[in-house]
Amino acid sequence: MFTLKKPLLLIVLLGMISLSLCEQERNADEEEGSEIKRGIFSKLAGKKLKNLLISGLKNVGKEVGMDVVRTGIDIAGCKIKGEC
């Protein structure tokens, strides 16, 4: 009976070690996959945020430019009419 216990114990230990190594490798792969996903999402979010800011600044610039033009036209019209 003792002769069967050693090989059986060895098989069990080797099986536990291989399962442990597989689990560690699987966890490492999952962590790497989540890091890749986070990197992709942060890049996409960064690009979208950048595009949103640029389009917002363009719209603000257009509005400010139009206000300046309107004010200039109003002042020019006032001076032409002599009402200023």
From Swiss-Prot:
Disulfide bonds join C78-C84. Pfam families: Antimicrobial_2, FSAP_sig_propep. Residues 1-22 form the signal peptide. GO terms for biological process: defense response to bacterium; killing of cells of another organism. Residues 23-38 form a propeptide. The keyword Protein biosynthesis does not apply. Expressed by the skin glands. Shows antibacterial activity against representative Gram-negative and Gram-positive bacterial species, and hemolytic activity. Belongs to the frog skin active peptide (FSAP) family. Brevinin subfamily. This is Esculentin-1B.
